[in-house]
Structure formats: C-alpha cells, structure tokens
Curated annotation (Swiss-Prot):
It is an enzyme of class 4 (lyase). GO terms for molecular function: cyanate hydratase activity; DNA binding. The lineage of its organism: Eukaryota, Fungi, Dikarya, Ascomycota, Pezizomycotina. InterPro entries: Cyanase (IPR008076), Cyanate_lyase_C (IPR003712), Cyanate_lyase_C_sf (IPR036581), Lambda_DNA-bd_dom_sf (IPR010982). It catalyses: cyanate + hydrogencarbonate + 3 H(+) = NH4(+) + 2 CO2. The keyword Lyase applies. This is Cyanate hydratase. Its EC number is 4.2.1.104.
Length: 159
C-alpha cells in the first residue's frame, strides 16, 4: 500500500489526544499499515480500530495483545497506555476545523431531526445507543467513476 494513503498523526495539531495515540500512530506509520490491515489483524472493524488510536474507544486485553504484536510495541508499555478509560469527545474542538469532520457534524445538524422523526416512527419513543454501537465505512464507485462514501451507523434501540 502506498504511504500516501495512510492516515498519520501530527501530534502538535492534536493537543488533546492521549499519549497512546502518538505511540500507536508512530508504529502504524513505521510499519506502513492501514487501519484496514490492523483491523483485520486484531479482529475489529476499521472505524473501531481507528477509535482506539484516537483514544475514543476502550481497548480490550485481547486488543492490546494483538496491537502489541502487529505493531511490534512492548506489550507492558502498550497495556499501561491503553488500560484506562477513554476521555471521549475531548479530541475535537467545536466547531471542528477539519472540513471532513465538520461535514459529519453538518449532516447531524441538517438531518438530525429528520433521523429522529423517522426513528421514532419506526421504533417508538427512545434513543439509539452510541455505546452498543458499530459503524462502518465503505467505498462505492458509480457507473460514471465517481467515488461515494457509504457510512453505516448501527446502534441498539432503547425505549
């Protein structure tokens, strides 16, 4: 895989990320691994794997062991960095400065009430969990050669 297609991290632009992020991203870049390949090696999906790198998801003991192996990071060191609880939501300023992250917020801003209305009609009054939750990102190319991002959110419904 070309190094141009690898997500890397300039920690100076992300002051609120945990120390584990710098360690994980450095190993990822050094080994030239994509989130797809790391996810396959640890048995998680790409977004869940990336969330661990950004300190937004808790790594299990199994995740830590597999990440240490695939990234060639000392297990005890990685365990000490990842054994705590994530400090979710702190890594992005509001409003977001990154255009892609801003567009994700914009989608919720523009369609949030529409999502809510349709979900309430389908499921009744309740909420979609962001804890019992999974998400995927797929690439779709149409007949004209245009690339489309397909983002799926799957959350348990609570009444």
């Amino acid at each position: 895989m070309s190094n141009l297609n690898l997500a890397t991290l300039d920690i100076s632009e992300h002051a609120n990320l945990p120390t584990s992020s710098e360690v994980l991203f450095k190993a990822k870049a050094d080994k030239k691994l994509s989130f797809e390949s790391i996810a396959a090696a640890i048995g998680r999906n790409e977004v869940a794997t990336a969330a661990i790198f950004y300190g937004q998801a808790k790594a299990s003991e199994e995740d830590i062991a597999k990440l240490a192996q695939v990234l060639e990071i000392d297990h005890a060191h990685l365990e000490s960095l990842l054994s705590g609880f994530p400090d979710r939501g702190k890594s992005v300023s509001f409003p977001p400065k990154d255009p892609l992250i801003y567009r994700l917020y914009e989608i919720v801003q523009n369609y949030g009430y529409a999502y809510k209305a349709v979900m309430n009609e389908k499921f009744g009054d309740g909420i979609m969990s962001a804890i019992s939750f999974s998400t995927t990102v797929e690439k779709e190319t149409d007949k004209d050669g245009n690339n489309w991002a397909v983002v799926t959110w799957r959350g348990k419904w609570y009444v």
